[in-house]
Amino acid sequence: MTGKRSKTNCRSASHKLFKDKAKNRVDDLQGMLLDLQFARKESRPTDVTLLEEQVNQMLREWKSELNEPSPASSLQQGGTLGSFSSDICRLLQLCDEEDDATSKLAAPKPEPADQNLEAGKAAVFQRGYNLVQGKSEHGLPLVDNCKDLSLAAGNNFDGTAPLEYHQQYDLQQEFEPNFNGGFNNCPSYGVVEGPIHISNFIPTICPPPSAFLGPKCALWDCPRPAQGFDWFQDYCSSFHAALAFNEGPPGMNPVVRPGGIGLKDGLLFAALSAKAGGKDVGIPECEGAATAKSPWNAPELFDLTVLESETLREWLFFDKPRRAFESGNRKQRSLPDYNGRGWHESRKQIMVEFGGLKRSYYMDPQPLHHFEWHLYEYEINKCDACALYRLELKLVDGKKTSKGKVSNDSVADLQKQMGRLTAEFPPENNTTNTTNNNKRCIKGRPKVSTKVATGNVQNTVEQANDYGVGEEFNYLVGNLSDYYIP
């Protein structure tokens, strides 16, 4: 009886000791779990990882201690897992489960066939540009679905090793036969006979220096060399070929550039030569745009909405050469809606290096004091059916006298000067003196009296020098009081 009681007391004391130890460990575990909860709320990933490892380590030690074949073990003495509380059982079961930090990596799933570079054969290029799927129904295939390229290419970079350019895009990828790059409705470009290798497009990015000595791109404002491919042989790229075809058909408005064209004459003569050769250059043909009526009366062709801080605007278009510009000694072209006034030639340049002529015209008189209209005509010797015109509208200082328009004071002074010139033309007889006073034929330039103010003389000379009227001319003056100097 005594032995049984002592055995019971020993078992009770051992159980109490184990219970107290378990209680302390549960308290420690509860504190760690609270710290872990706060660390997650405060977004401290380092502390979260450390606390999770401590919790797992504690549970592993506890489980190892319980499984030891020791007399002090409650399980060894007949205790079962069911004798523990539900919380301890749940923790012991969680310890048996492997978490993400300690579990082994699962076998990776096989990648799709289109992401394998060896099996897919440049699938990124096919998926991004859709060049092998067939001809595009919406124009240029190089533009369609371009937004998916970065996403598709990103799936092929795993960070293990850098991929070479030819490994990604497979330079031996071929287009389907008869691929014309979206120019299905452009008979002038024709179609491609046979496949085109993508490696042929690499020189378009950075052509060699020698290429710039050959023919340039036919687009009027592009100085890059033409590549010579079958379906855009006169252009540097398919994009410029599309621009030249779509921006220059008949019926379109002239090319407009707020701020000016900003190109030298060489590119403009090159565009004219390309047009004469039957190429599309991106400049429309506008028949009579500069000569049928005044440009300020043609809003359907010339937009005159001046932008903020804009001081110059230019238009560019093709038209038939107007030989009427050279009619008469004054080389002028009257406009039907401007009371017989219009364009006056001020300069003619023989451009030997380009094989053509450049003529400059000014509007006489200018319609406004603070705006000036100028017209430039480009012609080449080998083409008589087409000329290139550059129309210019320029904001000038209103205080300065506008070119091509003489102030009223200057006209009045010149009328007085003409009245003092009778001494240079003596009357033939007394009977015809009265008639000749009303009607005289004055040849050559009028000589200004030395008594006239020098300011008016300088103003008149500047007008003559500016517009290049250097030859002799005849005026038939009917009434000196109505004489008008244009």
From Swiss-Prot:
GO term, biological process aspect, one: long-day photoperiodism, flowering
Recorded superkingdom: Eukaryota
Compositionally biased spans, kind Low complexity: 429-438
Subcellular location: Cytoplasm; Nucleus
Chain residue ranges for the region called VOZ: 208-405
Keywords: Activator, Cytoplasm, DNA-binding, Metal-binding, Nucleus, Phytochrome signaling pathway, Transcription, Transcription regulation, Zinc, Zinc-finger
Induction comment: By far-red light.
Binding site for Zn(2+): C217, C222, C236, H240
GO MF: sequence-specific DNA binding; zinc ion binding
Annotated zinc fingers (C3H1-type), start-end: 217-240
InterPro entries: VOZ1/VOZ2
Annotated GO CC locations: cytoplasm; nucleus
Tissue specificity: Ubiquitous. Expressed in the vascular bundles of various tissues, specifically in the phloem.
Role: Transcriptional activator acting positively in the phytochrome B signaling pathway. Functions redundantly with VOZ2 to promote flowering downstream of phytochrome B (phyB). Down-regulates 'FLOWERING LOCUS C' (FLC) and up-regulates 'FLOWERING LOCUS T' (FT). Binds to the 38-bp cis-acting region of the AVP1 gene. Interacts with phyB in the cytoplasm and is translocated to the nucleus at signal transmission, where it is subjected to degradation in a phytochrome-dependent manner.
Record-given protein name: Transcription factor VOZ1
Organism of origin: Arabidopsis thaliana (Mouse-ear cress)
Gene coding for it: VOZ1
